[in-house]
């Protein structure tokens, strides 16, 4: 159990259901314990490999916004192997921001201001979080949600991401311009104990990640404790780059 207080509490509590099918990227069909069939919103445009297996137990929230066509939102998956996954990718930025504000991430402490979605860079980007203080360099933070588990390792990305490649170039340029730059992997799958770039999925992203780190971009990985009650920050997780570098040198 993490010593940190919960960052996010689900109010009202999440409700369980059985996943029937995820489709059209943004929708999923479920059946509640009472037998009610629902179509719910899925705020995840990724491949969701291993996160959307029919028959898994999913947990959903319900919005009180009367204008929403699909008031229920898919938040968590409880896999048949007992792992928990936060499939709502919008939560990653929120959780990292809350952890910084609550001073739970030592590597990112000591800043007075947190700004969100600030325009920056040579490729017309927006940074997820910009930390500022009078006596420190500006700190640019790009947050990525990690949920792909393969062979006991968490991988990012789960599909080719030109946008993610652009973000790595932008972060590297921030360092060149004298700023601090951080790639923060928010590991939202409780079965993941270590993280690596998914070279087998997006080779260019993996190459850019190595280049960015060598240029001074910091890569920070943290796990989270997930439950239908809420989400808390867990421990820092290792990033595996040495094996990838060794395999590249051998080619």
UniProtKB/Swiss-Prot annotation:
Gene3D superfamilies per record: 2.40.50.580, 3.40.1350.60
Single GO MF descriptor: DNA binding
Matching Pfam families: SfsA, SfsA_N
InterPro entries: SfsA, SfsA_C, SfsA_N
Family affiliation: Belongs to the SfsA family.
Name of this protein: Sugar fermentation stimulation protein homolog
Gene source species: Yersinia pseudotuberculosis serotype O:1b (strain IP 31758)
Gene this protein is translated from: sfsA
